[in-house]
């Protein structure tokens, strides 16, 4: 019984599309093939280069694996683009923007899997590909199973703009066509596209009639063909316009080019080909491997570039008309010029581009935006928004690497004025915006959190020069924390800055601190050194007297008139001058008490116990402050009593949005005083304090969006703890959000306008605060330049929004909790539950663009493949490798002279081990492996016993390597043991006080693929043999036990004397280790063919289960139960559950939740962090019932059903049927985001007494790390 949840969302971009989706130019992104995000290009943000940036509009987590995104236009909404999204296993969905609800609507769903029973339909290489006719927007095509095409005809727009079919349909029925029906030669389709320059719908189809690969070049060569086919979808017939045969077998994809250039590009591994409308071609060779692998003759030879085009992306620059941007997998940039001879493209030419101070690795997609911008998505690092521009003209044009007399094409081509003007002006790229990317995460280590007593999570990210360590913390940790006062009484406190003038002196400022408990109030002040002192003690020393009223409870305090201190008590409102002289007291109406108070300018708004709002005005008479009844008032918006009030200066407009602009062109932010009042029946009043602007909204149900009150409200009373209209964001993008805090949850609404009326839509929160009626909402000072909102409590939170994210809750990492937040002199301060006042800062190097704060540290410019934590010396040890040319060697490591020395060599890896200091995050020592092409496959810090006679343990770093010599030679490797020793640091570098010392080097046949510690001994997997070795006094390793393994052990995990071994092809094996006598005891194994990527133990009390992740993106829960008949007396592991996670989990670690519960946290290739949590039986039953109701009753994004996504019965090798499914944390957290009536309906089906228990059960999902920070 387990729960699966994403702790952080995917960050690796897999698809991108620039379109007009919401009525403005948008960028649509898919991250990790699951997270759909809609951005707008913001050109009104003042930046250094006046380049646009990206702002997130909305995002959705999809219950499906996206394989393609393209845009179409439909007759019912022709001014906007709709999205055609293809999903794994031949599914497609069409969505459009709904401006009234500020969300997406599913317009059409298409499933094409019925009747397709071929086994390869579900293979990964047969995933579906979506394309659309962007030139005419009349058709879409979904390619799946390599040779089946599903066409969806879109009804064309007639001459009358208002012409719509009587049925209201916008699509004709879709149908499936086998590729061979278009032309009998077409099979094994590799890629398709719709071509642009044709009057009728025309497709370009890249296919391979005879399957082959480069290794078959002596038998089959150039087996790929390209066909241009005119398709009449309505008549269901086709005509082949032209065919081009004999293309290289390494052709990858076809890219259509817009008019007036037209035609298409075919990207091969070694060449780029341009195909015109008559199926004629021209091309450019980018390396000298092309001549070996293909007989195709190309017009231009630029083989000295030595490019590899596998994974390259191309973006055509429409503004230039004859230039495209080429980005290679290793991050090189080139401009691809189409040199014309008249209207014919005569040749292609590549010119290198030097980027301006940015790096890109493994591009996944490109999208051309407005104003010369191009978005570059990446799977292995940050995704970038760049802007192209022309540099200064070159004084002497570079010589092109032509083959023969191809320069004639350049002399007579390019007759347009623009081409002539820009030919000798190099294309350059400037960074406009950067989006955080953390994929792929390959290794995970748990280290000491230097900001608290908990742990920090360190993982490897990126590839090559973009590789880095990512330091993640489950909470926003205080940085440079300073304690200011101990044992401050009361559970509330406020800082009150005031100004006062002494006779003949310049005005001074002082900050008072007011705290209160249930009986008394206390006054302090902050001295010049930042120390808090009790006013009563300081006045005794100076023999002065303060008149602060202390024998009452204070519910609110603030500064007023810039020089007065306000104290709102239960029955009176007191105001003091800056020296705390005799106060002026204003008594509240008899029989009422103050419940809540706010200050807005010179006004004090007090919410009384009878539900009325009393407004007072502060005035100064003879330099003394006084309070009087204000002339303004608030007319009640409901017959029920007011239960919450908030007042602030806001730029929200209740009617049509303001069209005012600043001189820079950005929208003018004219703020005005606004009061928000919430009533018990759910009515919500927004009123301008000094104007007639007034808006009454219906928030009774806390539904997905709230609008003007126009009918009956939800009948259940609304329980409200606090309310705020708070600005979130930074100085560039700052927007007021409506925040409601109830006893169970936090609800955040974002404002938007529809039909010139203000509405609010609910923001989906991935976590909800724990149940606590003592929580409060507090405006906190800027955190690293961002406006945030604090949520106090035993576990406090910060509500944060960045330019690229929606508002999200991030836990505040104070272990003592925070019952109040405040600030003085721009410093962040808070009061803990223990009565300690502390101030702190926050590390600016941590990014807040994920659910967990993350810090990226680039170290050595090499790929970091492994990381481990050395606890004794408090350092991290990493394994890195770099790409080097492959040198062919024989069995004796002698170099074999190449028969083709002029051909671009293959590449291999050369590895190293390095120490990273966790305080400076720099590399302080390295060990380069001696053998050529030797790289680490595993690296672990282990504590080994020294001989059997001593109880002493020594922590060392065990490294297993492989010498990458090629598949024709037997594998070789080495086992290293390194000690981390303390040395005298270098001068002016105190962090260099650690060094690696090699203890053991054992070079043998076979690669060392996994190492770990078991009962103080070292376990190492060498080839297909597992060895357990003991460390002796002379620091040598002696084998004490062994076990034969199956194929390739990819991971080994230990728990005391128990071992879990994961095989790359044969699932897992559960093994025990005994020391008296030494022996390996095989307990049980899984007999299914599971391609294991990582595995670990999951513990709940006395229950032990195994969590296994595989390459097919599944999670398996296995159990060892010898008493179960299906286990064959314990010989087989029982499969208790199978769950499709939708991501490849590359590494995992067991993390304690409390003393008897451990969860498994994993890092994924898409840049996300996940966890699997054991769940108690009673909580599991309740949550399973809630999940079932949400799955069955609620509408799902894009119509994709969670149950069909998570459980796929077609996947082979699942073994005996699971009887306890893993709970989906994302589906469960939707309960906290449902309207109140649905929450009550679903909870009441379990029984009324379970309602509160369900909220506590959700803490299993949202607050797992309170003990870890």
Curated annotation (Swiss-Prot):
Sorted UniProt keywords: mRNA processing, Nucleus, RNA-binding
Pfam families, sorted: Beta-prop_RSE1_1st, CPSF_A
Composition bias, Acidic residues: 395-412
Superkingdom: Eukaryota
Keyword S-adenosyl-L-methionine attached: no
Coiled coil: none
GO CC annotation terms, alphabetical: mRNA cleavage and polyadenylation specificity factor complex; nucleus
Biased composition (Polar residues): 416-425
GO BP term, example: mRNA processing
Family statement: Belongs to the CFT1 family.
Known role: RNA-binding component of the cleavage and polyadenylation factor (CPF) complex, which plays a key role in polyadenylation-dependent pre-mRNA 3'-end formation and cooperates with cleavage factors including the CFIA complex and NAB4/CFIB. Involved in poly(A) site recognition. May be involved in coupling transcription termination and mRNA 3'-end formation.
Protein name: Protein CFT1
Origin species: Yarrowia lipolytica (strain CLIB 122 / E 150)
């Amino acid at each position: 019984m387990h729960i699966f949840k994403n702790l952080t969302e995917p960050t690796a971009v897999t698809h991108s599309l620039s379109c007009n989706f919401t009525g403005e130019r948008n960028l649509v992104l898919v991250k990790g093939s699951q997270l759909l995000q809609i951005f707008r290009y913001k050109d009104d943000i003042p930046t250094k280069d006046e380049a646009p940036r990206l702002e997130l509009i909305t995002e959705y987590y999809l219950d499906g694996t996206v394989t393609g995104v393209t845009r179409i236009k439909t007759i019912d909404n022709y001014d906007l683009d709709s999205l055609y999204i293809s999903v794994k296993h031949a599914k497609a969905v069409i969505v459009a923007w709904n401006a009234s609800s500020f969300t997406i609507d599913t317009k059409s769903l298409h499933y094409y899997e019925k009747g397709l029973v071929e086994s390869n339909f579900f293979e990964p290489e047969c995933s579906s590909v979506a394309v659309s006719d962007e030139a005419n927007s009349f058709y879409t095509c979904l390619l799946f199973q390599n040779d089946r095409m599903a066409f969806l005809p879109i009804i064309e727009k007639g001459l009358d703009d208002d012409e719509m079919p009587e049925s209201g349909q916008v699509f004709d029925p879709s149908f499936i066509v086998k590729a061979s029906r278009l032309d009998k030669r077409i099979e094994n389709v590799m890629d398709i596209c719709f071509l642009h320059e044709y009057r009728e719908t025309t497709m370009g189809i890249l296919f391979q009639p005879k399957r082959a690969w480069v290794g078959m070049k002596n038998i089959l060569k150039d087996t790929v063909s390209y066909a241009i086919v005119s398709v009449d979808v309505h008549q269901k017939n086709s005509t082949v316009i032209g065919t081009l045969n004999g293309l290289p077998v390494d052709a990858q994809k076809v890219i259509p080019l817009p008019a007036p250039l037209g035609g298409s590009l075919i990207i091969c591994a070694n060449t780029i080909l341009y195909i015109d409308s008559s199926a004629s071609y021209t091309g450019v060779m980018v390396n000298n491997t092309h001549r070996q692998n293909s007989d195709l003759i190309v017009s231009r030879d630029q083989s000295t570039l030595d490019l590899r085009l596998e994974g390259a992306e191309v973006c055509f620059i429409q503004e230039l008309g004859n230039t495209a941007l080429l980005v290679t997998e290793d991050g090189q940039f080139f401009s691809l010029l189409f040199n014309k001879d008249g209207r014919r493209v005569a040749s292609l030419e590549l010119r290198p581009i030097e980027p301006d101070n940015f790096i890109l690795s493994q591009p996944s997609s490109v999208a051309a935006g407005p104003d010369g911008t191009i978005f570059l998505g990446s799977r292995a690092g940050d995704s970038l928004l760049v802007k192209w521009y022309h540099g200064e003209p070159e004084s002497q044009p570079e010589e092109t690497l032509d083959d023969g007399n191809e320069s004639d094409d350049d002399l007579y081509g390019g007759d347009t004025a623009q081409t002539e003007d820009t030919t000798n002006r190099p294309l350059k790229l400037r960074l406009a915006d950067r989006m955080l990317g953390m994929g792929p995460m390959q290794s995970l280590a748990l280290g000491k959190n230097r900001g608290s007593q908990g742990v920090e999570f360190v993982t490897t990210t990126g590839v090559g020069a973009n590789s880095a360590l990512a330091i993640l913390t489950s909470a926003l940790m205080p940085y440079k924390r300073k304690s200011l006062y101990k044992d401050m009484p009361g559970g509330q406190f406020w800082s009150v800055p005031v100004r006062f003038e002494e006779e003949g002196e310049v005005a001074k400022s002082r900050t008072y601190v007011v705290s209160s408990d249930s009986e008394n109030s206390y006054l302090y002040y902050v001295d010049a050194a930042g120390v808090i002192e009790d006013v009563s003690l300081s006045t005794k020393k100076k023999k002065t007297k303060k008149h602060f009223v202390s024998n009452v409870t204070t519910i609110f305090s603030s500064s007023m008139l810039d020089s007065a201190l306000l104290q709102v008590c239960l029955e009176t409102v007191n105001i003091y001058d800056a020296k705390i002289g005799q106060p002026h007291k204003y008594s509240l109406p008899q029989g009422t008490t103050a419940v809540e108070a706010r200050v807005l300018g010179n006004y004090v708004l007090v919410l009384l116990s009878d539900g009325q709002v009393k407004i007072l005005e502060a005035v100064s008479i003879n330099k003394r402050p006084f309070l009087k009844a204000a002339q303004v008032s608030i007319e009640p918006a409901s017959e029920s009593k007011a239960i919450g009030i908030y007042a602030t200066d806001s730029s929200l407009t209740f009617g049509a949005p303001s069209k005012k602009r600043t001189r820079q062109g950005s929208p003018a932010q004219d703020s005005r005083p606004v009061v928000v009042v919430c009533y018990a029946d759910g009515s919500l009043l927004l009123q301008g304090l000094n104007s007639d602007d007034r808006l009454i909204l219906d928030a009774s149900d806390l539904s997905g969006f709230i609008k003007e009150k126009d009918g009956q409200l939800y009948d259940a009373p609304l329980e409200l703890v606090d309310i705020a209209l708070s600005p979130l964001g930074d100085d560039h993008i700052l927007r007021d959000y409506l925040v409601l805090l109830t006893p169970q949850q936090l609800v955040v609404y974002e404002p938007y306008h529809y039909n010139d009326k203000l509405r609010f839509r609910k923001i989906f929160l991935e976590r909800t605060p724990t149940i606590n009626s003592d929580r409060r909402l507090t405006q906190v000072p800027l955190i690293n330049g961002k406006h945030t909102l604090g949520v106090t409590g035993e576990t406090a939170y910060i509500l944060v929004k960045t330019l690229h994210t929606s508002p999200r809750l991030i836990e505040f990492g104070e272990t003592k909790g925070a019952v109040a937040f405040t600030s003085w002199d721009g410093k962040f301060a808070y009061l803990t539950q223990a009565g300690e006042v502390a101030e702190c800062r926050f590390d600016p190097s941590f990014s807040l663009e994920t659910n967990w704060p993350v810090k990226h540290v680039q170290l050595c410019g090499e790929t970091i493949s492994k990381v481990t934590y050395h606890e004794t010396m408090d350092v991290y040890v990493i394994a890195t490798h770099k790409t080097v040319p492959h040198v062919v060697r024989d069995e004796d490591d002698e170099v074999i002279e190449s028969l083709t020395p002029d051909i671009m060599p293959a590449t291999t890896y050369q590895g190293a081990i390095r120490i990273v200091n966790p305080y400076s995050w720099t590399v302080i020592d390295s060990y380069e492996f001696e053998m050529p092409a030797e790289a680490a496959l595993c690296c672990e810090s282990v504590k080994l016993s020294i001989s059997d006679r001593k109880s002493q343990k020594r922590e060392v770093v065990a490294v297993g390597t492989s010498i990458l010599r090629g598949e024709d030679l037997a594998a070789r490797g080495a086992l290293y043991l390194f000690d981390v020793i303390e040395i005298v640091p270098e001068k002016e570098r105190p962090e260099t006080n650690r060094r690696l010392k090699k203890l053991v080097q054992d070079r043998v046949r076979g690669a060392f693929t996994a190492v770990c510690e078991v009962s103080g001994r070292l376990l190492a997997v060498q080839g297909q043999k597992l060895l357990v070795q003991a460390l002796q006094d002379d620091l040598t390793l002696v084998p004490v036990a062994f076990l034969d393994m199956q194929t390739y052990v990819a991971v080994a995990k230990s728990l005391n004397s128990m071992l879990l071994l994961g095989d790359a092809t044969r699932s897992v094996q559960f093994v025990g280790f005994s020391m008296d006598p030494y022996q390996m005891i095989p307990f049980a194994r899984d007999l299914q063919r599971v391609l294991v990527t990582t595995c670990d133990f999951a513990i709940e009390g006395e229950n032990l289960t195994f969590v296994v992740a595989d390459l097919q993106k599944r999670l398996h829960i296995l159990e060892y139960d010898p008493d179960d008949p299906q286990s064959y007396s314990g010989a087989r592991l029982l499969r208790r559950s199978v769950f499709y996670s939708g991501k490849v989990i590359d590494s995992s670690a067991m993390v304690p939740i409390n003393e008897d519960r451990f969860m498994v946290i994993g890092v994924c290739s898409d840049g996300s962090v996940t966890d699997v949590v054991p769940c108690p039986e009673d909580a599991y039953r309740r949550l399973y019932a809630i999940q079932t109701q949400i799955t069955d009753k609620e509408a799902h994004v894009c119509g994709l059903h969670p149950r069909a996504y998570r459980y796929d019965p077609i996947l082979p090798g699942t073994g005996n049927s699971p009887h306890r499914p893993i709970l989906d944390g994302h589906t469960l957290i939707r309960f906290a985001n449902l309207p109140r009536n649905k929450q009550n309906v679903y909870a009441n089906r379990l029984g009324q007494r379970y309602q509160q228990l369900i909220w506590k059960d959700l803490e299993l999902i949202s607050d797992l790390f309170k003990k870890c920070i």
